[in-house]
């Protein structure tokens, strides 16, 4: 690393790969503090608001989302908002990016951001600044971005494709006290199985002798969840599931049987954004847009109404990962209950054309689209309850208490992806991991 930092090569990138417990966090925390003392400029980035908050806490330095730093909103256009790659006005700055396994490079059709390829845009932005370089860090055993087989930002060949000189380091030795941590012991075993491509039988989870990993029968779930909520709070407890359908069942049960919430939406409800939204933050400096996966807490529910065959609510939200930033939005209630990640395409289209009919008197298509862009119902925020989420949604975050429900498992589900899923879920927990209704044959 010292060679990279002292090198005069501006086209170099440092790739720091490390598994759970190998000291990545401590190393980068020390690096950031040292750079500060040497008055060497650094900027910390992460793919999501929650990941940026976690990064900032352990580095003792402000951290931002990648999108916040590298994109800027284009001036008013006829279509919906677009963000272009920003000009990098910094000089001789090291950009340190955590949780790089989450950085996608699949060109997303209809993406509002730059080329739609986040890694391409990040590299273009950083190296357009005089003397600026990139340090990418992450864990290759974690889930790759949705739709990709591997995490492109953690592979040297992908980075060499930009004409960059890649300096890579792999931290493999576990330095945290593995003997005392069942989470770490099992996570290390899982990533060894992934590395050896030994993913053809259900992995045995070692529980005996460890205080931080517990098997939880279904009949103790409500009492244990309740105890975690009372002791550590809603924001330090999460249920991780394999599907949105399963997460829905949990969310419904938690709200009814533990939190005693009778209304569809109550003050204090914990929500997760289900789809990027650019409308409600257009005039706000604190957030450029509301990203898919961000968490929000309901501060006030004012009124609900039914229109176009959908249900909406005027709600004040607080975003805990953005210094409790408060925002008033119109929210689509229907997505709270769908088994899909957000409103299904057919329903989205139905909403679009229903709202469009309101502007049928406007004959110029461009003017009609302007009206759609400014319509609070078409732009209603799509959310889900956030007491239980899928593993992709939990990635980048950490909680004191993680309840893991892997659902019914058979050999046909055994793929490297399942092992990455399990590894990613295990490493979300900083305190206790509860294995809910785990099959006896998988426990040792």
Predicted region positions:
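C-terminal accessory regions
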Residues: 307-444
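ASCE P-loop NTPase helicase motor core
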Residues: 13-201, 206
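Amphipathic coiled-coil/heptad-repeat helices and related helical stalk/stem segments
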Residues: 1, 28, 81, 115-119, ...
